[in-house]
Amino acid sequence: MILVLDFGSQYTQLIARRLRESGIYTEIVPFFESIENIQKKAPKGLILSGGPASVYAKDAYKPSGKIFDLNVPILGICYGMQYLVDFFGGVVVGANEQEFGKAVLEIAQNSVIFEGVKIKSLVWMSHMDKVIELPKGFTTLAKSPNSPHCAIENGKIFGLQFHPEVVQSEEGGKILENFALLVCGCEKTWGMQHFAQREIARLKEKIANAKVLCAVSGGVDSTVVATLLHRAIKDNLIAVFVDHGLLRKNEKERVQAMFKDLQIPLNTIDAKGIFLSKLKGVSEPELKRKIIGETFIEVFEKEAKKHHLKGKIEFLAQGTLYPDVIESVSVKGPSKVIKTHHNVGGLPEWMDFKLIEPLRELFKDEARLLGKELGVSQDFLMHHPFPGPGLAVRILGEVSESKIKRLQEADFIFIEELKKANLYDKVWQAFCVLLNVNSVGVMGDNRTYENAICLRAVNASDGMTASFSFLEHSFLEKVSNRITNEVSGINRVVYDITSKPPGTIEWE
């Protein structure tokens, strides 16, 4: 196992993902993790991530110096390399020419870490400081036009000024793999087949004959959790799907069909009337989210109580992923809340369940791979992300049954055309937003004054940042024509070309 010490880089999670993609299990902890906890994990190597600080600043992030007593190989990346240089007595200064973006790496000396790597390759730089003097015992392995010490080595300690974890670094994956396999002696034992076998055995032992309650949203995470649990405990799983009436067209039927195919009993609760009555007259986004969250808990509690009376439920399952775990102990501290997230948090006290989070070690792409391993259909697994509050946050202003129907039909057309054009899997997320404005139009010889709808499609890797998708004008024209001709009450279609930041992916 490789352990990454996080110094606050935006790329830290990519380090773990790249190594896991190579079959090497990797975890992330904050840089201030105690040496005792690090020892308990027994890593075969440490990677010190990049970060936004300067090593010579008073408030610079610095780990315990005892990491060097562990006698395991260490790789410092960007800030991590600068920390190593500073710790061992070298000199790091603010660079006159800062490096951001692509640069050419030229290997100057052979090293095991560059085994099978091209002499010259493109790498990704993102730093404002530079090393001007190496500590005693270190040698320079590679350079770039603005970094004379772009890669360094001293025995089992290595430093890279560039970011091998980002895709723009052509040989980055190979370099990380060399460190893990050739330097640290790791083996390629990580994969979803192994994870599924191990986790099913663990769940069987932990849960035994107890019952587990699992809220199913119809998304990837909760579906994979339910499938994994059912493999482990069969009918002791109680899967509950709350239909709040704010789903995409045919969504309920799609989820029911999937669970039937997986042979998992699904308790479907039709709560559309309750949700819509409570949302009546409400237009403020955060209030809509709050009402939906509270109503979900109310409906979920009622259903849970019914099953609880039949036989005590001991566990509650959630689809927590590894990024959630990492961020809960982030070196950056609590972030300002942009939007609240709908979850099953805030459940009543009588639900004193023990929490089970089978996916807490996995990234989103790994959860999809696990789903595939467990037999969940590829089509289902590749469905675009969908917010917990559903279409309520894609209808600007007050929610009504007629608006939901209008949005469902328009959204269905947009997604259908994306699939026909083989574009659906090329964009990260696509959907329609029903705007709370009307516009003047002409249909035949008549003047209309109807709703405008917005198409939104973005490219992203994890949703933290996103850029709008460049869709052909002819494609957008086709979608616009279909929506205005086939969906009653819509006479104008617009396309959102805002990236994140400054905007968010969803409108509310």
Swiss-Prot record:
Pathway: Purine metabolism; GMP biosynthesis; GMP from XMP (L-Gln route): step 1/1. One of its GO terms (cellular component) is cytosol. This is GMP synthase [glutamine-hydrolyzing]. The keyword ATP-binding applies. Residues 190-383 form the GMPS ATP-PPase domain. Keywords: ATP-binding, Glutamine amidotransferase, GMP biosynthesis, Ligase, Nucleotide-binding, Purine biosynthesis. Catalyzes the synthesis of GMP from XMP. Homodimer.
